[in-house]
A protein has these predicted regions:
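Alpha-helix C-terminal capping segments
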Residues: 133-139
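Short gly/pro/ser/thr-enriched loop/turn and capping motifs at secondary-structure boundaries
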Residues: 126-129, 148-152
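Short glycine-/acidic-enriched loop or helix-start segments at secondary-structure transitions
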Residues: 101, 131-132, 153
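N-terminal organellar transit peptides
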Residues: 1-127, 140-143, 157-291
């Protein structure tokens, strides 16, 4: 290789290095300008129907819908870890749900709150019981005046068909390892001791519910208890009681979320993290204490 050829290669290498440096510099400036303009998006997570534990499942027999705790948790995790998701808008249209599934989702919402990303709640037609448990975890809650919400309380039900079994001449018998192994059996009456045990469970979960609302809404626990008798409230009534922050629809909540996340409210982009697969709620789920 001649000296002239070497000089050409050195010059070419210098040009390439300079171009790379300029590219890195311009990229950094572009990113800085992007952050300065507040670019990014609002992550939107939807909770529709009753909240249940486990994964989304397909069932040709099921015409009902609901929200899987595992799916909602996955979406919330992605929104929390996504650096471009500057705020999270959770649209809730749910009448109730299982306690464990609701608490799982609530824990993911706590992690988002700890990351300092704002969570804005938009209530749909109904955001009651388990739906309100989750709503109370948000930084700010929007509802429509006629939204059905509240229903702060816990219940556990069971059916006893002992008399019916006697009428049709069918007898149920079982072998069990302990006196209470078949508690909630529909084939025998509940004992007084069992009723006390179950009432204790319901009372414990009720206290957890009340404490969650009191903490989330910065309310005195006794004040929450005074309205935590299962009553249904309109959105306007809930606002008067301190359970809702403002009247507004989905887009009002979206604008507030964008503003809270430092985004341009005139050019809001949204992103959802839902699976593309169409799933239906399984009919066959175990018994659970419900909110």
């Amino acid at each position: 290789m001649t000296i002239q050829t070497k000089r050409k290669w050195i010059l070419l290498l210098a040009v390439l290095l300079l171009a790379a440096a300029l590219s890195v510099g311009s990229t950094s400036l572009w990113k800085a300008e992007k952050e300065k303009r507040g670019e990014g998006y609002v992550a939107v997570v939807r909770i529709d129907g009753a909240i249940y534990g486990g994964p989304e499942t397909d069932s040709m027999l099921s015409g009902s819908s609901g929200s899987s705790s595992e799916e909602i948790m996955r979406e919330l995790q992605e929104a929390r870890k996504d650096p471009q998701a500057k705020a999270i808008l959770i649209r809730i249209n749910s009448p109730d749900g299982s306690t464990g599934a609701t608490q799982e989702i609530a824990e993911e919402m706590d992690k988002i709150r700890s990351s300092k990303k704002p969570i804005v709640i938009s209530m749909g037609d109904m955001c009651a019981s388990a739906g309100y448990w989750l709503a109370s975890k948000g930084n700010y809650i929007f509802a429509s005046p006629a939204t059905m919400t509240g229903s702060i309380g816990v219940y556990m039900d069971y059916t006893n068909i002992e008399d019916l079994m006697d009428k049709v001449g069918v007898k149920n018998d079982k072998i069990k390892s302990g006196a209470h192994k078949d508690i909630l059996s529909m084939y025998r009456p509940m004992t007084g001791e069992e009723r006390e045990m179950l009432q204790s469970m319901v009372d414990d979960i009720y206290h957890q519910f009340v404490q969650t609302v009191a903490d989330g809404r910065h309310m005195d626990e006794e004040k929450v208890k005074s309205i935590a008798d299962g009553r249904i409230l309109t959105g306007r009534q809930a606002q008067d009681l301190g359970l809702v922050d403002a009247m507004g629809n989905y887009y009002d909540a979206l604008n507030y979320a964008a503003s809270s996340g430092g985004l341009d409210v005139d050019h809001i982009e949204t992103r959802s993290y839902t699976n593309s697969a169409v799933t239906l709620r399984s009919l066959l789920r175990g018994e659970a204490v419900r909110l």
